[in-house]
Amino acid sequence: MLMQIADFEIGLNNPLFLIAGPCVIESEALVMDVAGELKSITQQLDMPFIFKASFDKANRSSHLSYRGPGIEKGLTILEKVKKTLEVPIITDVHEDTPLQEVAAVVDVLQTPAFLCRQSNFIRSVAACGKPVNIKKGQFLAPWEMKQVVAKAWATGNKKIMVCERGYSFGYNNLISDMRALAILRETACPVIFDATHSVQLPGGHGTNSGGQREFVPVLARAATAAGIAGIFMETHPDPDRALSDGPNSWPLAKMQPLLETLKELDKVVKNAGFLEQSSE
């Protein structure tokens, strides 16, 4: 299934596209710098790009953790990125978010993994009419996403993506099953792989989550080789000082070489075709 986002189309047989940015809006300056650098890199690579940042991280491990600037200031910053740099924007929303207010600014709405089974929430987000990236819960089998997508489609909005971000594996650990990417294609939605949250160690540091960012390129390459429409990565100029998800954020300075590799892999895989689609 092909889907239009801003001025480009996404789908399994289209070139790989990127969703990337810092986990949370820390400041206008940082957001503008990261978005500008990502736009420059993706323009050089001729890779479609959607900028991602959150104005409110509602599911932090500790109530003392930084959540973001809030919706008013956050949307103002995201709108500036969109207008100044001319890039499409994606941000996540929650059950108490004024959805229409966010939809008036961004190009894609994203639903958090923890909320993928909240039926009213999924329907409300989809009913906005914007493209939606539904992140699969860490507790959900890939085939269960068909029912989540059906709830969204029931609103009449067919512009739905599904995003794989790992599976809970014991306490404070996630693993990635590459078979899930092929299974998720059966939803008939573009499939995205979140390479950074997939290396997260949820709650692994007690008051915050840990992560193994050294494995980001490993999983990103594997997912691209499996066949996906897009790759999702949170990035930061100095991940060790990031205010949210630093341990699993990929360094901004290393984004270009990783994306160059993924672009080449994507081209080879999609030119060869997907034998599993005719394995029977």
Swiss-Prot record:
Pathway: Carbohydrate biosynthesis; 3-deoxy-D-manno-octulosonate biosynthesis; 3-deoxy-D-manno-octulosonate from D-ribulose 5-phosphate: step 2/3; Bacterial outer membrane biogenesis; lipopolysaccharide biosynthesis. GO terms for cellular component: cytosol. Disulfide bonds: none annotated. Keywords: Cytoplasm, Lipopolysaccharide biosynthesis, Transferase. It catalyses: D-arabinose 5-phosphate + phosphoenolpyruvate + H2O = 3-deoxy-alpha-D-manno-2-octulosonate-8-phosphate + phosphate. The keyword S-adenosyl-L-methionine does not apply. GO terms for molecular function: 3-deoxy-8-phosphooctulonate synthase activity. It comes from the Bacteria. GO terms for biological process: keto-3-deoxy-D-manno-octulosonic acid biosynthetic process. It is found in: Cytoplasm. InterPro entries: Aldolase_TIM, DAHP1/KDSA, KDO8P_synthase. It is an enzyme of class 2 (transferase). Its EC number is 2.5.1.55. Belongs to the KdsA family. NCBIfam families: KDO8P_synth (TIGR01362), PRK05198.1 (NF003543). PANTHER family: PHOSPHO-2-DEHYDRO-3-DEOXYHEPTONATE ALDOLASE. This is 2-dehydro-3-deoxyphosphooctonate aldolase. It comes from Coxiella burnetii (strain RSA 493 / Nine Mile phase I). The lineage of its organism: Bacteria, Pseudomonadati, Pseudomonadota, Gammaproteobacteria, Legionellales. The gene is kdsA.
